[in-house]
Amino acid sequence: MIKAPILQSLLASRDDLTHNPEVNNFGGKEQECLYLLKRCHNIDEFKQVHARFIKLSLFYSSSFSASSVLAKCAHSGWENSMNYAASIFRGIDDPCTFDFNTMIRGYVNVMSFEEALCFYNEMMQRGNEPDNFTYPCLLKACTRLKSIREGKQIHGQVFKLGLEADVFVQNSLINMYGRCGEMELSSAVFEKLESKTAASWSSMVSARAGMGMWSECLLLFRGMCSETNLKAEESGMVSALLACANTGALNLGMSIHGFLLRNISELNIIVQTSLVDMYVKCGCLDKALHIFQKMEKRNNLTYSAMISGLALHGEGESALRMFSKMIKEGLEPDHVVYVSVLNACSHSGLVKEGRRVFAEMLKEGKVEPTAEHYGCLVDLLGRAGLLEEALETIQSIPIEKNDVIWRTFLSQCRVRQNIELGQIAAQELLKLSSHNPGDYLLISNLYSQGQMWDDVARTRTEIAIKGLKQTPGFSIVELKGKTHRFVSQDRSHPKCKEIYKMLHQMEWQLKFEGYSPDLTQILLNVDEEEKKERLKGHSQKVAIAFGLLYTPPGSIIKIARNLRMCSDCHTYTKKISMIYEREIVVRDRNRFHLFKGGTCSCKDYW
């Protein structure tokens, strides 16, 4: 007779068990308990069912029952379920490979990757032989920990056990090596595959996306689509959309969207969020909003993508309204959402509103402010020209002041040409022994503004000694599905001669509009004429010349940049949009700029 109220409710609809005389034999008892196990919806129900397994001597006499109980708990996702699962595991006299796999998978699911590796070590010490279900989860743990050493050791064990031909293991190896930066090893595993499946290609694409290798990611994706009849898996599609978002490859992103609509009846929230992110970063805010509004369910990542997108387009007030909508829907803002909202305030000059959001975050107490949040606050004040207040904020921060905070402050000091405060930030940044080449370049540029040429030379010498390499600034234009990449003073393009002829024509036209180059943007100790020549060849100007030549008359010229544009390029582009009567959209590292009729959507606040 079952007396516990929870168990009675679980069995309420199962008359075939409660009234069946055979339920008293061993098989019947086990069937009853396994049925109860499936119906558990929380840890309290589960504990009562677990107790019943023990009371009926099923847990210790049936390995199948013990493994089922363990798997239900470990894979449930309930709060603290893995702690309870660990106690269940210790109660099993002779755990089998399935039980170890259950624990490894459970720990990986809750992101306790070190625990997963510990269980694998215990498994090997006890003599349990891993199987093809063991390694995908284990390699995922190595991937998330960036533990290439352990990953290579596990690869060796995979080889010894003859599991290297298993498709799931192969794809996990490709992903692990790729995301740990070992691209050659990732490619080597891929090339050895006898049959390259959609999953293998998707693993290659995802690995490149995980390392921010956007161009390589898209090359692989295009290769898969053109050289095979395979259709990428969801993970590959999401990675390709991420790459499109980061390179401004709108046409390819739209093609992927079309493919998804034709082949998948209902897009899940991950894919829909990826589409929102792709469209906002490719300059199509209306399309992103359309997808967002049609979504039946939205999560924090969806709102974060939309709020960040509105911020990119200078729609700070709309971003704040979106934030309010999220709260009304009952979602609790997390770390990522607050960063997005604070960035939106920063890029729209909403100082009062940004302070209010930050104060509310502190008051709520559900999100502990990190260096990233404080960095947003410093950026908000710095962009508004409140550098003294920004420094006071930094000095009052209750957490360790890391490179993010000082880099943000230094960047705003350089923009505002405040050498005195900038030197304070530079000194603090150098104390942190930064190995970020961008930091040294920022410091060097600050010294250049102050004509402190000895300090410039010393900083650049340090860059050389440390072997640091700065990624050069570039601008990208997409034309007929192909991306054209330009760097400063670029003469590598096949149409170089025509492009520079166009640049010369543009320069001639600008003289009649009163354009005067801002020589302060060339931070080198060279004469005035040399500075003018260097300004002419900035990558954005070369990209605009290409766009004017080869895009249809009257169409919008779209440019994606990897760095913030300089003030001279900003002024230059405003005037070109008026002279040639063309809309020019530029996405730099911080936001979108829509140049039209001699003005910019950022209202000169960027």
From Swiss-Prot:
Residues 512-606 are annotated as: Type DYW motif. GO terms for molecular function: mRNA binding; zinc ion binding. Residues 405-480 are annotated as: Type E motif. Belongs to the PPR family. PCMP-H subfamily. PPR repeats lie at residues 96-130, 131-165, 166-200, 201-227, 233-263, 268-298, 299-333, 334-368, 370-404. The gene is PCMP-H11. Keywords: Repeat. It comes from Arabidopsis thaliana. Signal peptide: none annotated. The keyword Repeat applies. This is Pentatricopeptide repeat-containing protein At1g31920. GO terms for biological process: RNA modification. InterPro entries: DYW_dom, E_motif, Eplus_motif, Pentatricopeptide_rpt, PPR_At4g14850-like_plant, TPR-like_helical_dom_sf. The keyword Repeat applies. Residues 481-511 are annotated as: Type E(+) motif.
